[in-house]
Every structure is written in C-alpha cells, then in structure tokens.
A protein has these predicted regions:
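Short hydrophobic/aromatic-rich beta-strand segments that constitute the beta-sheet cores
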Residues: 66, 110, 144-145
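Low-complexity, intrinsically disordered terminal/linker segments enriched in charged
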Residues: 144-166
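Short, low-complexity N-terminal intrinsically disordered segments enriched in polar/charged residues
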Residues: 1-58, 163-166
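Hydrophobic/aromatic beta-strand elements that line small-molecule binding cavities or substrate pockets
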Residues: 81, 95-101, 114, 129-135, ...
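Short, cysteine-centered beta-strand-loop-beta hairpins and adjacent loop/turn segments enriched
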Residues: 90-91, 115-127
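A solvent-exposed, acidic/Ser-Thr-rich amphipathic alpha-helical stretch
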Residues: 53-106
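A short hydrophobic beta-strand element
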Residues: 104-116
Length: 166
C-alpha cells in the first residue's frame, strides 16, 4: 500500500517495476498503479471542492455505487450520484488529510475534514471528519464510494490517567 507521502508499505519507491513487489506498475494494468489511484482520489476531491461537476463525473464509472452505511442509503449510477452532490444543501469545503491506495486490490481510502455551513447566514460553521473507501475498475475509474461520518463524543470516565486529549 502507498500513502500520499509516496512511501510504499514494502519500502519500494513509487513507480518501481520490480515484478516481485505487488501493487507496482509492472503488476497492474494501466490506470491502476498506486500513483494513478491516489491521483484519481485527489482529482475527485479537487473537482468536488471546485464544484466542477464535469471533472468530478470524469472520475466516476457509469455504474458507480455510493453507500452511506450509517444512514443505510445507497445511490446507484453516475447521474444520480452527481445530482446528489450538486444538490447537497448548504456550503461545504473539504480538506484531504490522507490518501492510501492499494493498486493490487484496486482500492483506496481517504481521510478528510469538512467545514459545513448551513443555508442561513447566522448558522455557525460545523467541522466534520469523514473516512471514505473507494474501489476502481481496470481503467482507474471509481466504481464504489463508501462514506463514514464519525461524530465526536466524550470518552467514558476512568481512563484519564492513560490518555491525553487533543
């Protein structure tokens, strides 16, 4: 696996062509190297932040499936997923904090932070964290997105002596 720092889990340099190293350029099809998968996720978020729905759609396979396990919602297909994002209420901005890609499994994960403001000017911005899992086809297009939106909560009492808060 490779993260956005460009260091491969096995210690190889990205783009290496060693046939013994799974997930490198020589053991995957074009468009599914770790760098290509990371690039696809970066392009997805860059386009979403810019509200460039044409570029956003270009990262998606026609049959993309979007899952939200916490609300048990599923969106099937590129057109519906584009509309879902275009029509999302309020204003939001995304910060990509980390992308990890696995070319051999044609999958990636991203951790993001969102700043969300409501439709009303007096509403205070809300900071949210999210974790996203992506799957890809052989061309490097996104075939699946699963989003988790964990909510912060106070820890249980009795472990203050073991932890530090941030």
């Amino acid at each position: 696996m490779t993260d956005t720092t460009g260091v491969t889990a096995g210690g190889a340099t990205p783009g290496t062509t060693s046939s013994t190293m799974p997930g490198t350029a020589s053991s995957t099809t074009p468009g599914t190297t770790t760098a290509a998968l990371r690039g696809a996720v970066e392009a997805y978020w860059t386009a979403a932040e810019a509200r460039d729905w044409s570029a956003f759609g270009a990262t998606l396979a026609e049959g993309v499936v979007y899952d939200l396990p916490q609300t048990r919602e599923r969106i099937l297909g590129k057109e519906r997923y584009l509309r879902f994002n275009q029509e999302y209420p309020g204003d939001w901005h995304v910060r990509v904090e980390r992308i990890v890609a696995d070319a051999e499994g044609r999958q990636a994960a991203a951790r993001t932070g969102f700043t969300v403001t409501g439709d009303q000017p007096e509403e205070q911005p809300q900071e949210l964290d999210a974790i996203h899992f992506f799957t890809f086809d052989e061309e490097g297009l996104i075939t699946g997105v699963t989003d988790f939106w964990p909510e912060s909560y106070e820890p249980p009492a009795g472990r203050e002596h073991l932890v530090e808060r941030y």
